[in-house]
Amino acid sequence: MSITNEQILDAVAEMSVMQVVELIEAMEEKFGVTAAAAVVAGGAAGGDAAEEQSEFDVILTSAGANKVAVIKAVRGATGLGLKEAKGLVDSAPAPLKEGVDKAEAEALKAQLEEAGASVEVK
């Protein structure tokens, strides 16, 4: 008996943000791919002012009270080592990820806020 796409989607819908991030990382490792959005080349030089923003920067503004949990969340989200993640958290406000799509930016923001950090998406 095989699992249907609907069953997989239902299982993912019941997961926490942290569990989804861990699942994505495991899939990237197992299949040798990345979940990063493909960069599309070309387009108008000036762009359209009314065009919706497609790339976002996730900025850690404050570590909050639970600094250890925030460092763990930063490590999980960025793949940084312990020393690098601690340095980034200590230097807040600091950019965590730049040029990510809206879904990834919002997921990262939710994950870090769940750990106790203050996060801004620009």
UniProtKB/Swiss-Prot annotation:
Keywords: Ribonucleoprotein, Ribosomal protein
GO BP term, example: translation
The keyword Ubl conjugation is annotated on this UniProt entry: no
One Gene Ontology molecular-function label: mRNA binding
Superkingdom of source: Bacteria
InterPro entries in UniProt: Ribosomal_bL12, Ribosomal_bL12_C, Ribosomal_bL12_C/ClpS-like, Ribosomal_bL12_oligo, Ribosomal_bL12_oligo_N_sf
Membrane-traversing stretches: none
Entry GO CC: cytosolic large ribosomal subunit
Function text: Forms part of the ribosomal stalk which helps the ribosome interact with GTP-bound translation factors. Is thus essential for accurate translation.
Subunit structure as annotated in this protein's UniProt entry: Homodimer. Part of the ribosomal stalk of the 50S ribosomal subunit. Forms a multimeric L10(L12)X complex, where L10 forms an elongated spine to which 2 to 4 L12 dimers bind in a sequential fashion. Binds GTP-bound translation factors.
Protein family per UniProt: Belongs to the bacterial ribosomal protein bL12 family.
Protein name, entry field: Large ribosomal subunit protein bL12
Organism per entry: Aliivibrio fischeri (strain ATCC 700601 / ES114) (Vibrio fischeri)
Gene: rplL
